């Protein structure tokens, strides 16, 4: 008997050190806004507003907490000594880029937090989580330990949930989490097909690979995740992302494709072997025909797709079809805006488009899809999670007040060395773990 299930979205709450340091080579938006003055308060409120709109529509909306930044334990591991004030002064003087890296609020993009396999797909019928090692970027490679603690604090019942450590943090097993993973199915509670998208084959130097920008996800990492999660060949498809797309600024597959249910919405340049990918999915998809919504380069040039983040949108079930939740930038790019008007009139599962303002995140290269981790849960599993992280009207009001009390409305690169900022962050996070009922998850709390 198939159990009823929902796809819950767990959005990253933007952290108090949200800034524009331009740390992500291959992420065009991140590099183009380097050294701009950020507004952490506005960023967090924009993220909360997006969550609230979706929760108000009846979607299960959860929250993943920000991380402690600047991260003093990492600076100590890099040889900076003394008390915390002295450490911040020393790193700001010696190498401001390192300070920017350990101060990044990049954990807000929870599509990179982990890969999640629903219980309907796994051998032991538990929901499996593997935090992404994010080894391609130093500032993100320090996230997975706290991410793992957060996930265990939320999904703690071992009879329903299985947690794995991140893969070895080396380039051969570079893993970027759910940003390179999507699941297709007839219904959420039915066994589905998990699409793992990789950029290169690490142990085969002759295999196709991008030339300008690095491929962050390897086939070896994707296969390892599938093994850890107990997925059979019937539940997994491995597809290579088009190297030309990576070189055009598509640093994760969720910048060029998004799936939901039996619908795959993608650009024609997304996959290296498009026909084989679609055939492999359809062969494994039970109970439904694959609805492939293909966007041609004539309709939307890949440069416009990257500039607008058309595909970094959330694709959500509605009563009469699917809703595409797009960033506001989609209405600022003519080809994309025109395409969206045509899309809702066409014969596809996508029947509605709604615009969301996540501009503070977009300037660092993260749209609506980057900000959320999808977790399919049946009714028993949903009942077993820590309900303190599920957004309600009361929690929204409390978190809004919390942000307004603790977040600055301006943050520049020079501010990262301010020892008061670290104190402000810790005070805020200590209060947040109480609000969400997470217990002690941060290094300063342990």
UniProtKB/Swiss-Prot annotation:
Segments passing through the bilayer: none
Tell me the route in metabolism or biology where this protein functions: Amino-acid degradation; L-arginine degradation via AST pathway; L-glutamate and succinate from L-arginine: step 2/5
> What InterPro entries does this protein map onto?
AstB_sf (IPR037031), SuccinylArg_d-Hdrlase_AstB (IPR007079)
Disulphide bonds annotated for this chain are none
Q: Where is the active site?
A: 176, 252, 370
- Alphabetically, which GO biological process terms does the record hold? arginine catabolic process to glutamate; arginine catabolic process to succinate
Q: What does this protein do?
A: Catalyzes the hydrolysis of N(2)-succinylarginine into N(2)-succinylornithine, ammonia and CO(2).
Put simply, this protein is called: N-succinylarginine dihydrolase
Q: What is the lineage of its organism?
A: Bacteria, Pseudomonadati, Pseudomonadota, Gammaproteobacteria, Pseudomonadales
Task: Tell me the gene name.
Answer: astB
């Amino acid at each position: 008997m198939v159990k009823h299930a929902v796809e819950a979205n767990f959005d990253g709450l933007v952290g108090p050190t949200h800034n524009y340091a331009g740390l992500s080579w291959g992420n065009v938006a991140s590099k183009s806004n380097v050294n701009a003055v950020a507004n952490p308060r506005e960023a967090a409120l924009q993220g909360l507003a997006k969550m609230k709109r979706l929760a108000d529509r009846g979607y299960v909306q959860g929250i993943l907490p920000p991380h402690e930044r600047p991260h003093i334990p990492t600076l100590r591991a890099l040889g900076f000594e003394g008390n915390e004030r002295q450490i911040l002064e020393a790193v700001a003087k010696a190498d401001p880029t390192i300070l920017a890296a350990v101060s990044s609020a990049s954990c807000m993009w929870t599509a990179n937090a982990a890969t999640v396999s629903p219980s309907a797909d796994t051998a032991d019928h538990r929901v499996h989580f593997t935090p992404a090692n994010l080894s391609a970027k130093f500032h993100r490679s320090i996230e997975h330990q706290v991410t793992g603690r957060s996930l265990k604090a939320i999904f703690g019942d071992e009879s329903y949930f299985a947690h794995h450590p991140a893969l070895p943090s080396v380039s051969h097993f570079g893993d970027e989490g759910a940003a390179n993973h999507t699941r297709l199915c007839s219904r959420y509670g039915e066994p589905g097909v998990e699409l793992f998208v990789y950029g290169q084959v690490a142990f085969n130097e002759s295999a196709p690979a991008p030339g300008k920008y690095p491929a962050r996800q390897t086939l070896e990492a994707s296969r390892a995740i599938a093994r850890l999660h107990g997925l059979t060949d019937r539940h997994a498809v491995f597809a290579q992302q088009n190297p030309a797309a990576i070189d055009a600024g598509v640093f994760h597959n969720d910048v060029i494709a998004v799936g939901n249910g039996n619908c795959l919405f993608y650009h024609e340049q997304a996959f290296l072997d498009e026909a084989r990918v679609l055939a492999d999915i359809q062969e494994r998809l039970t109970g439904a025909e694959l609805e492939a919504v293909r966007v041609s380069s004539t309709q939307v040039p890949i440069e416009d797709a990257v500039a607008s983040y058309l595909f970094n949108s959330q694709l959500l079930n509605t009563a009469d079809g699917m809703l595409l939740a797009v960033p506001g930038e989609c209405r600022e790019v003519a080809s994309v805006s025109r395409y969206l008007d045509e899309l809702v009139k066409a014969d596809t599962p996508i029947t509605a488009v709604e615009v969301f303002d996540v501009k503070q995140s977009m300037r660092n290269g993260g749209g609506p899809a980057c900000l959320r981790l999808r977790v399919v849960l049946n009714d028993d599993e949903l009942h077993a999670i820590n309900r303190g992280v599920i957004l309600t009207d009361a929690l929204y009001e409390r978190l809004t007040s919390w942000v307004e009390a603790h977040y600055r409305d301006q943050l520049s690169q020079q501010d990262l060395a301010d020892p008061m900022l670290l104190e402000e962050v810790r005070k805020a996070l200590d209060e947040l773990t109480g609000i969400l009922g997470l217990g002690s998850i941060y290094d300063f709390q342990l």
